[in-house]
Amino acid sequence: MNANDNKQKILEAVDAGFDAQLATTRDFVAIPSTRGAEGPCQDMIGDLLRERGYEVDDWHIDVEDLKDLRGFGPIEHDFSRARTVVGTYRPQNNAGKSLILQGHCDVVPVGPLDMWENPPFSPVIKDGRMYGRGACDMKSGTIGALYALDAIKAAGLRPTARIHFQSVIEEESTGVGALSTLQRGYRADACFIPEPTNGKMIRSQVGVIWFRLKVRGFPVHVFEAGSGANAIMAAYHLIHSLQKLEAEWNERAQRDHHFGAVEHPINFNPGIIKGGDWASSVPAWCDVDCRIAVLPGWSVADAQSEIIACVSAAARDHRFLSNNPPQVEWSGFLSEGYELKDSAAPEAAFGKAFAAVYGGGGAVPERAFTALTDTRFYGLNYNIPSLCFGASGEAMHGFNEYVDLESLRKTTKATALFIAEWCGVEQV
């Protein structure tokens, strides 16, 4: 059987298994796997891998093992149940190139339930879309990669290289799930992460810094509010100054060879605000959790220094904060940006797969991504070229999140053909 016959059989196998793939995806999306509650998802992945005969490594993550590694971000919540699950396929004939397939099972909070058309963890298929929290980001991609492997087997083939299928947590907040796989010793010739990229390869992505502003005020009864100091209002003063820093960084970004053409690639977001104890008391405290991006090549340490300098300068210009300076705490991501390069071989292999599914000459569309993915750990820490390509969808981190099912079918096909091309296959 020639290579074209193999391709056709794999494509047909994806189609034949697509209903089962959607059923598994729906079950996966139905698990509420917000931060700290990912265990049932990891249980499901472990069971799916064992059913398929993979060698399964399921371990609890020890933060002490990771805290000195490049890209580690502070963990602030209970991490005692944090787990990583890796399924390994070992070939009988080791003739191809090894591969890591990775997906994350953690999802972000859903927000007010009354703003969803359907309950976020009761996935619905309608008009060619699957709706639900995590349906797009990125549970459909994770299950799609698993069914891509299934399609190769269903086609009567088996890969001729080692494959690690990795389900990680913390992608949405620190990335230490992916970091834990590298600390554990998992390596390969390439990595592929099927995040929802709208059918484009991520060429360059920002890094992200999470930090918390801790502002103190002076509480008094509201009838004499002028004699107190309102910590919430003072926090807004700092936010306005950080918006100016955001503007400065976006001006700097115009000189970047990938992000120069992207409108507003650096996004500052005050995402959580807490403060005060009583509506009739001038608030004595306010905490603001913030996120800001940095470009590839920018130093995280230098960016941290600029953030601190910005906050300090704003405090000096404030009546109360000048004598009661706010604190800046690092509360999650301390992540560098990543540019995919030195990756000609896996990109050529994926280009063949892309051409077979999408048509054209194998020129894969690219994007500069104003968020981040776990690819950075593989590329920056261990020089493992890490490709990121996946389906289309909308409303990630918002209401009524969905993945487009036809795009998911195509990306599953492209993933399966890429595995076959990169790892090699032989008849069973």
Predicted segments — roles?
Residues 127-136, 220-222, 403:
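A short glycine/serine-rich beta->alpha loop
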Residues 102-103, 167, 192-195, 214-216, ...:
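Short beta-strand segments
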Residues 2-130, 159:
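Acidic/His- and Gly-rich active-site-bordering loop/insert found
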Residues 110-125, 203-214, 352-353, 387:
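Acidic-glycine-rich active-site phosphate/pyrophosphate-binding loop
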